[in-house]
Amino acid sequence: MKRAAVLLLTAGLLAGMVALVGCGEKKTTLETPEGRVEVSEEGGGKITYRTGEGEATYEQATEVPSEEELGAPIYPGAEFNEEGSGSVTGSSAEGEYSSLVAEFDTRDDFDKVHSWYKGKLGEPLYVDSEAREANWSKVEGGRVVSVSIQGEDVGVKIIISSTSAPLSP
């Protein structure tokens, strides 16, 4: 249960940090129901969050991560989207954790992308053909790897994430 909470917190922090990268703030302190959060922007798309329970650092991606780093294949010809990609590393009382998220776009249609990933990863955990979305997830080597595809007006958005966190006792 704690591991799931850490994974969800990491994903939430990553989403929030992506939104804050361009804000230009250098250092801010926030009061939340859970306590004080210190936010520091260190430049170059790097933001650090510190609380009484640990810290997390987000860094916006500038290079395409490898399939090995992601733990999943990258759809051929898909274009890397730096703005939707980055990494989080941090520590808490439970130990160290890290998350890497890479976003890609392709002009290919949903069915073609879905078929390709199905051939590489097997049946998705979730698929909604009408909404044009599918998700795969696996736990491997101490990390959770997820692939999500979402049909867009033109083409498909692909999000691959790899998260490592301490195992719950």
Q: Residue ranges of each PLM-predicted region?
A:
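Low-complexity, intrinsically disordered/propeptide-like segments
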Residues: 10-12, 16-17, 33, 124
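An acidic-aromatic pocket/loop used at catalytic or ligand-binding sites
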Residues: 23-169
